[in-house]
Amino acid sequence: SLGGFLKGVGKALAGVGKMVADQFGNLLQAGQ
């Protein structure tokens, strides 16, 4: 169903966003 598909896409985007945020945080800490 479309709802399930969108939910899956949202989960994937959230996972990628978290990964990027973690990497960004590590870079900021390393730069200080």
UniProtKB/Swiss-Prot annotation:
Function, as annotated: Antimicrobial peptide.
Tissue and organ expression note: Expressed by the skin glands.
Name by which UniProt lists this protein: Dermatoxin-J2
Cysteine disulfide partners in this protein: none
UniProt keyword terms in alphabetical order: Amidation, Amphibian defense peptide, Antimicrobial, Secreted
Any single biological process term in GO: defense response
Statement: the UniProt record of this protein carries the keyword Manganese: no
Subcellular location: Secreted
GO CC term (a single one): extracellular region
Keyword Secreted: yes
Modification Glutamine amide occurs at: Q32
Organism listed in the record: Phasmahyla jandaia (Jandaia leaf frog)
Protein family according to the UniProt entry: Belongs to the frog skin active peptide (FSAP) family. Dermatoxin subfamily.
